[in-house]
């Protein structure tokens, strides 16, 4: 079955701090960030911050919260609206566990079309949200960009995706050279241009199984034997330790020991209490040979989620606004 829109959820990270980078970000929690709710991600901007300027980071996860272990394919992530206030937001892809001081990715951003563009054009001039874009460089050579005068959720207007072959910055003015001519004409008043992060597939992942046993075996080559479930998988390093020929304990580096043991005589599917669904499954058919006390299997799981860092910059002297917002859009396919 395909992944449904309502099965794609934004979730917060476990840690939030504006003073200790090592305490900001981290792993995904299973709370939900509801779109349109005040302070769902960032706190209010104080008068002191508006006067002096400020930068804050917040981490979120876009979780494929589907009971079907189907991958979200041809994933595209982009900012689809300008902030109405004087601040601006870019996003940077993260890792399942990184905190603010470990952010290593590059930013992605958005701009408004500055000059009308005709069908067949191979160059765009856009106005970025701030001259700081010249330092951050959220548009880069080789990027896929979205050019559109319609909402990301659909409706009237046009949308197209094109690669850029060169970028130049002059303050907030950004010139983009296109690898292929545009198929449509666009007007400055209604057209936004976004740099796009891409991934071929997003799904739970079961990786790096290592079995330590002299006479036991694990079939890692048969599809479906080892599953990290979209709904319940977390970022974890797991160790299964055999108690005897059939039963084993299950522990994770972050979770510690799970209360219920597993057995090679049945599928092992320990339940994530936050989602009431399994973290992972090891099929009984994947085991063979003879095990003994002390044998171990270690492996890693990764959640079916995109870790995203939002960076909000409030330039010095910014005006106040009661209903500020930033909008990140996701496009993908499933079968």
Question: What is the predicted function of each stretch?
Answer:
Residues 1-116, 144-148, 156, 187-196, ...:
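Long, small/polar-residue-biased beta-strand-and-loop interaction regions
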Residues 1-24, 142-145, 164, 170, ...:
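Membrane engagement elements in two modes
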Residues 42, 49, 122-135, 178, ...:
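Short alpha-helix capping/helix-loop boundary micro-motifs
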Residues 52, 138-141, 293:
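Short, flexible surface segments
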Residues 55-59, 121-125, 173, 237, ...:
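Intrinsic-disorder/low-complexity, polar/charged segments enriched in Ser/Thr/Lys/Arg/Asp/Glu/Gln
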Residues 67-68, 82, 166-174, 245, ...:
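Short, conserved beta-turn/loop elements at beta-strand boundaries and strand-helix junctions
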Residues 97-188, 196-236:
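Autoprocessing Asn-cyclization modules and mimics
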Residues 109-119, 192-304:
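Polar low-complexity, Ser/Thr/Gly/Ala/Asp/Asn-rich disordered segments used for subunit assembly
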């Amino acid at each position: 079955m395909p992944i449904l829109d309502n099965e794609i959820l934004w979730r917060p990270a476990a840690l939030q701090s504006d003073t200790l980078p090592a305490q900001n970000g981290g792993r995904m929690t299973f709370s939900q960030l509801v779109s349109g709710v005040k302070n769902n991600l960032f706190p209010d901007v104080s008068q002191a911050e508006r006067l002096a300027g400020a930068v804050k980071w917040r981490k979120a996860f876009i979780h494929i919260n589907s009971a079907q272990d189907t991958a979200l394919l041809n994933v595209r992530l982009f900012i689809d609206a300008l902030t109405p206030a004087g601040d601006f937001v870019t996003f940077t892809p993260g890792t399942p566990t990184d905190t603010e001081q470990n952010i290593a990715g590059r930013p992605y951003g958005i701009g408004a079309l500055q000059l009308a563009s005709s069908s067949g054009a191979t160059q765009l001039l856009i106005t970025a949200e701030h001259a700081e874009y010249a330092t951050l460089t959220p548009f880069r050579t080789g990027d896929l960009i979205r050019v559109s005068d319609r909402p990301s959720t659909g409706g009237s207007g046009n949308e197209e995706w094109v690669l850029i072959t060169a970028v130049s910055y002059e303050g907030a003015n950004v010139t983009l050279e296109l690898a292929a001519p545009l198929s449509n004409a666009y007007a400055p008043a209604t057209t936004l241009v976004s740099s796009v992060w891409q991934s071929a597939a997003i799904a739970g992942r079961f990786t790096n199984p290592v079995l330590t046993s002299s006479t036991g075996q694990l079939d890692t080559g048969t599809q479906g034997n080892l599953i990290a479930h979209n709904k319940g998988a977390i970022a974890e390093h797991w160790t299964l330790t055999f108690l005897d020929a059939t039963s084993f304990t299950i522990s994770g580096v972050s979770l510690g020991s799970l209360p219920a043991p597993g057995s090679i005589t049945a599928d092992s599917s320990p339940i994530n209490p936050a989602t009431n669904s399994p973290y992972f499954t090891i099929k009984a058919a994947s085991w063979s040979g003879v095990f003994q006390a002390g044998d171990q299997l270690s492996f890693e799981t990764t959640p079916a989620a995109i870790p995203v860092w939002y960076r909000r910059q409030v330039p010095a002297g910014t005006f106040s606004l009661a209903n500020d917002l930033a909008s990140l859009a996701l496009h993908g396919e499933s079968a």
